[in-house]
Amino acid sequence: MKVMVISPKNKTLFNFRGDLIKEFISQGHEVVAIGPDKEHIEEVLALGVEFIEIPFVKDNTSILGDIKYYMELKKVIKLQKPDLIFNYTIKPVIYGSLAGYSAGVKRIYPMVTGLGRVYASKSLKAKILRTITGILYKQAFKGCNRVIFQNSDDLKQFVELGYLPEEKAVRVNGSGVNMERFNANELPNQPIFLMIARIIKEKGVFEFAEAAKMVKKEYPNARFILLGGFDKSIGAITPEELQPYISDGSIEFPGETKDVLPYLKEAQVFVLPTYYREGLPRTILEAMAMARPVITTDWPGCRDAVVDGINGFLVQPRDSINLAEKIKFMINNPEEVQRMSRNSLDLCKEKYSVDIVNKHMIEIMDLNKNRSI
């Protein structure tokens, strides 16, 4: 069977979907991957896939760009004749599903990996875009077999908005985490709090920095490490805006890295005060796999992985004072940190291992090698 994977960024093909693609291939399926450019092409091809480049405009208001993307997808789908399409994130989900259905593909399984800024913002522009996007989602989902969601909030919201019937929606536990790579190790004694994210406002970067500033006045030995790259999207934080927190010693900022493992090993607690509408943050799962307690927000996706008081804490979005309080609790209660550490690992083994998640994905798409075609 030929499986087509439609991606918004080449990097996600091996970072987030690599294990799933390998599972497709191990089940005896041919995989064609579609991405927007030739970035990271060596890593993509190393998965054992055929790669096709179809650029698209990331701007939500580029109507002509979207039409061109849809037409190119339809053209390639007609030529490739895939048996099944697996597509993820907003534009690949909408236009990949519409193009696939129009081209006669009988099995289409889009995955909603979060709702993005459009569904989190209260601006007039966001409201208009939500209306347009909703119409497109509703039309796109008509030709799909199942629609896969990564958290319960997104699934519930789309069903309540009438984008799809409840029986067509199914939830998986995020993208899963490779527990052989992210394996548990001992917690350090020093209170080291790590945040990994793109440097944008909605990820809670300022809340992390402000909380760090407050806590360090009382606990100067505590360390706060922010890991991630600067971004050019709406809501991006500039180096100049971040610099005061670095200069006064509130946070350490190593920048972006290809390997987060050494930083997770060094950290005692993982922190992600996000209010961005993503599916289920992969960084939270990686921290849990390494037996790290997590402080995150009471927010879609985050509250699926973290049980308040069990494997970490849920704080209010945009609230650096609430965040600082929970950080201080972790510093003052090392035995609770140890307990939450064990619970994080147990929860990850039970629900979020990539093997468990991928098995569920294969079952949803009915791609077991023993299936009779």
Question: What function would you assign to each model-found segment?
Answer:
Residues G35-E39, I196, R223-I237:
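Glycosyltransferase donor-sugar binding loop
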Residues G228, I237-T257:
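Nucleotide-activated donor-binding/catalytic signature segment of Leloir-type glycosyltransferases, i.e.
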Residues P293-T296, V306:
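Short hydrophobic beta-strand element within catalytic cores of glycosyltransferases
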Residues N322, F329, E336-K351, V357-E363:
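A short, well-ordered alpha-helix in the C-terminal region of glycosyltransferases
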Residues K265-G279, R292:
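Acidic donor-binding loop of glycosyltransferase active sites
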Residues I52, G134-N183:
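Donor nucleotide-sugar binding/catalytic pocket of nucleotide-sugar-dependent glycosyltransferases
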Residues F14-N15, D19, P191, M195-M214, ...:
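A conserved mid-protein helix/loop that constitutes part of the nucleotide-sugar donor-binding site
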Residues V307-G309, F313-S320, F329-E335:
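Conserved acidic donor-binding segment of nucleotide-sugar-dependent glycosyltransferases
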